[in-house]
Amino acid sequence: MQPYEPKTKKPVVHRAIFEAIKQRIKHWESDATIIAGRFGSGKSVAVREALRGVQGVFVHSIEDADWKDKLFKRLGLAGPDMLEDVLCRVQAQLEKLGGLSKVPIIVLDIPRTTMEGMDTVSSFAKYLCSDDTMKAAAHVIVCASSAAMAMAFDAGGEQRQKNYWVEDFTDDEAKEFLALRGHREDWEQFVQACGYRALDLDLTCGDYEGPATLAAKKEEMDKKARKEVLRFKDQCKIAGDTGKEILEELLANRQAGKGADELCTAASPKDVAMWIRERGYHSVIWHTVKQEYQFASELHANAATEILKSTPSRRHNWP
């Protein structure tokens, strides 16, 4: 049984989240694992690196409502009836090998473009991870492209899933990441221009032609953050001035280093997360582990400070 080896085109910075996921795999007993985080934070990389060298891993992308049929076809199965027997055989082999995981691992990767199929993902994961009637189990890891997709997952309540959140880079991670791309000395200029999101830093490294590239990138990022904050404030009106209420609460709590509780607005976090996903104005995120709203980045927090300081406040505490 071949160990899983992710295809990586560039050097990867080791991150604490890799080890956290590895420990989950090593000590797994039941229930699905959900990996979420801001778009471009490196969720897929985190999952794949945590699984590097692990045996019994299968990765499948959820692209439409027919994803299960495609999964069975890729596994060489005529249908779901054969799945349990295959899992039994794989589990028996894994127990003999004594590797990190004693059960098969199925990774379900959900791209941002996926619009359907989450209900069947939830039931599939519950069946494989938590169903006591199964002769064999499988550890299902769901890598969700957005908080909305992670929150749409429901395998029987929070007690039947374990959530992990992939943050943006820390200072040390960003420094190492940029050093690997030839920017050890000017790494601070990169994060000042781009922030700490892995995708932004990676793309800017690819485009870099000198200091002017960073100046142009900073201007572009500032404009984008301002636009996203304005759109969220003015257009997110799920239940009253939803967007504005969330932004005001975030600013009020910013100095204390806290996010905004879901009760700062009458709208549910799930509805807000879906609105953000559908509209594409990612100024705010719902953190699925800390269970709070947060600014997507310091750029968005700074833009919100400037925009709201001239706007009358109408904060509420909703029941």
For the regions a protein language model found, what residue spans apply to each?
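Residue-level preference for the first positions of well-ordered beta-strands
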Residues: S30-I34, G56-V57, V103-V107, H139
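Walker A/P-loop nucleotide-binding motif
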Residues: W28-E49
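Conserved AAA+ ATPase "SRH/arginine-finger" region at the nucleotide-binding site
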Residues: K162-A174, R181
